[in-house]
Amino acid sequence: MKAWTEVDIPGQRGRTAVVTGANSGIGFETARALALRGATVVLACRDLAKAEAAAIRIHRVAPQATLDVVPLDLASLASVRAAAGEIRARHDRIDLLVNNAGVTGLSGRTEDGFEIQFGVNHLGHFALTGLVLDLLLTAPGSRVVTVSSIGHQFGRIDTDDPDAGAGAYARSKLANLLFTYELQRRLQTAGASTTALAAHPGGAATEVFRYSSPWFRVPNLLIARLFGRTPAMGALPTLRAATDPEAAGGDYYGPGGLFEIRGYPERVRAAARAHDRDLGRRLWQVSQRLTAVTYPV
């Protein structure tokens, strides 16, 4: 089987993509690759200066790219609402939403009182997706791609207290998959052409570990470098989920090599609990209550 690479990304001219956390790492590489194929790319980032610097870097390799920068702090529901409002004011459709931004190793709470990894990685993206979903529904064949992690298999979620206990990062990444599968079921039931997919980068050397303790950060970066997982390689599963004409709603992409740490993107299988429909439904209900965001599907 031929390895899927950036060369396989179809033309994206006329399409609008929103990428969260697009200023660095996998998010930057995702935005760059989409811009090179002609997409209008919205870089939705917490640090506006870094986002603008990323846009300059993309313009160096894609001078004709149409780029937009929107401030987005996923640790603040007020910021999420403001970002959604800015996106809606500037764009009348979204063909692709990539929920990429993430944190790990941070302690503390979001502005709204949620455990920060669960709040940023899951609840912030849940809110953003709901607030712009009608723009996706307007675009035939649009996609929502949410970036999870191989670490989701260690996650456990108690929907009575979803952000409590140890293993916050794994829990948030499990939530990403539960959200994806529940969103896909709802879209399918509604007869929408919009689809929900997920991806994970394998072991890629990115800034997601920058807040982690050394005992966690250093081994992860060593593994990434040992197996040659640059951010550009780490972005390939996301890009395949986002653009491959053969990708279908509910598909999950990751590296096809040993332990899904390295290799080119292929369809992979999430842990059984990520497919728990009852858990997905209950997490959805809790997420709606915590964010005060309801969905049109």
Task: Locate predicted features.
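C-terminal helical subdomain
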Residues: 221-268, 277-281
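Generic recognition of well-ordered alpha-helical segments
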Residues: 182, 237-240, 286
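Short linear elements at protein peripheries
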Residues: 151-153, 252, 274, 284-285
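Pocket-edge positions in alpha/beta enzyme catalytic cores
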Residues: 43, 72, 226, 272-275
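Soluble or luminal CAZymes and related metallo-dependent hydrolases
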Residues: 79, 124, 175, 230-233, ...
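C-terminal amphipathic/interface module of NAD(P)-dependent oxidoreductases
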Residues: 271-297
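Rossmann-fold NAD(P)H-dependent dehydrogenase/reductase core
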Residues: 1-212, 289-297
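Short glycine/proline- and charge-enriched loop/turn segments
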Residues: 159-164, 214-222, 262-271
